[in-house]
């Protein structure tokens, strides 16, 4: 079945994520899309991230682990791109959580439109002192995406 779907490379730069990276990867493994690899780039972590990733990788064949000197998130993403084998590339952060149908929906949309880049809305939250905050909630709008692109409207740090 997975041969019917092109390989998607999910690139995750990480730094000092030993406390939560296993949870991120475990949730990511629940994707309904059958053909993906996870390229995780450990960007010179000073904590136990390298050992946590190595242990996780022993039982998860989708995981490709790259350890490099710290160079920042953009350098880590570029390293991941160079190692990726997929026809499509998807970026995530090391603390992101995505819907189990995310890759399948993105692939379906790309297949329907033939688009070179596929974009979706974003919802984010964080927990501080036991209170959940939801500061990010953007719905996808094709018209505003084009506007944002041409006016270089950047909503988030991208490297």
Residue ranges and their predicted role:
Residues 1-159:
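Nucleotide-sugar donor-binding/catalytic module of glycosyltransferases
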């Amino acid at each position: 079945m997975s041969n019917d779907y092109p390989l998607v490379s999910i690139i995750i730069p990480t730094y000092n994520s030993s406390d939560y990276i296993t949870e991120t990867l475990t949730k990511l493994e629940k994707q309904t899309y059958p053909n993906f690899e996870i390229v995780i780039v450990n960007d010179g972590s000073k904590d136990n991230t390298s050992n946590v990733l190595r242990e996780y990788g022993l039982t998860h064949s989708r995981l490709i682990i790259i350890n490099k000197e710290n160079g920042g998130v953009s350098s880590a993403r570029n390293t991941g791109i160079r190692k990726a084998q997929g026809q499509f590339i998807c970026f995530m952060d090391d603390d992101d959580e995505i819907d189990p149908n995310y890759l399948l929906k993105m692939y379906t949309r790309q297949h329907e439109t033939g688009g070179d880049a596929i974009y979706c809305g974003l919802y984010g939250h964080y927990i501080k002192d036991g209170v959940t905050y939801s500061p990010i909630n953007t719905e996808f709008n094709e018209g505003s995406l084009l506007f944002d692109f041409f006016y270089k409207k950047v909503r988030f740090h991208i490297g």
